[in-house]
């Protein structure tokens, strides 16, 4: 079974980008609260 590298990269970005964005917002919020 051949893995489609572009599909894998697209899926990884689709998951990682929003996760990183939310993580940055969370860190900023915690920093401001402290």
From Swiss-Prot:
Chief location bin = plastid
Query: What membrane topology is annotated for this entry?
Result: Single-pass membrane protein
Q: Which GO terms describe its biological process?
A: photosynthesis, light reaction
Gene Ontology cellular component annotations, sorted alphabetically: chloroplast thylakoid membrane; photosystem II
User: Transmembrane residues, as ranges?
Assistant: 5-25
Query: Where's it found, cell-wise?
Result: Plastid, Chloroplast thylakoid membrane
Give one Pfam family, short name only.
PsbM
Question: Its family?
Answer: Belongs to the PsbM family.
> Its quaternary structure?
PSII is composed of 1 copy each of membrane proteins PsbA, PsbB, PsbC, PsbD, PsbE, PsbF, PsbH, PsbI, PsbJ, PsbK, PsbL, PsbM, PsbT, PsbX, PsbY, PsbZ, Psb30/Ycf12, at least 3 peripheral proteins of the oxygen-evolving complex and a large number of cofactors. It forms dimeric complexes.
**Could you tell me what this protein is called?**
Photosystem II reaction center protein M
């Amino acid at each position: 079974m051949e893995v489609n590298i572009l599909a894998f990269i697209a899926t990884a970005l689709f998951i990682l980008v929003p996760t990183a964005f939310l993580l940055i917002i969370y860190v900023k919020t915690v920093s401001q609260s402290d």
